Amino acid sequence: PSDRFQTKHLIEALLKDEKPAYIRTGRNPVEDIYSEDNCPFEMDKATVIKEGTDVVLIGCGEMVRPCVEAAEILEKEGISATVLDMYCVKPLDTEAIIKAATNAKAVVTAEEHAPFGGLGSMVAQVVGANCPKKVVNVALPDAPVITGNSKAVFDYYGMNGEGIAAKAKEALA
């Protein structure tokens, strides 16, 4: 989940569900994306935070906030971005990905994970099979990484609003 409000909704939903579940959260506090009064949540469905036309930014967990920041940066440069909060990767909301990506020019995923076998790989498969276009994954390197709090690590690897916006512009070029 991307913030405390979404985490609360997710836990409440899981308490009513008989299936096994796994939740991954960071240990550091994160800035809220949602509020008590505005936290759209549907089990196993991505949340559209912002609708745009040029590029789709798909984040999960702590990487949703940098996607929102990237969309704000891009908007100042005349680039319209959709932002999807993909809080759940299993099952993956393929319908939301296809709907968002179909008319966009490119897709950028952002995840606190290695570049292989995670959100980026799954989104690339869905987009490639249904609405082919460039997919760029912003992720940790497939190698040992530096240690530190989330912000320090994300900034070091360009996994922040500026870095995601730059990757989106490269994908659109």
Region annotations inferred by a language model:
Residues K19:
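A short alpha->loop->secondary-structure connector
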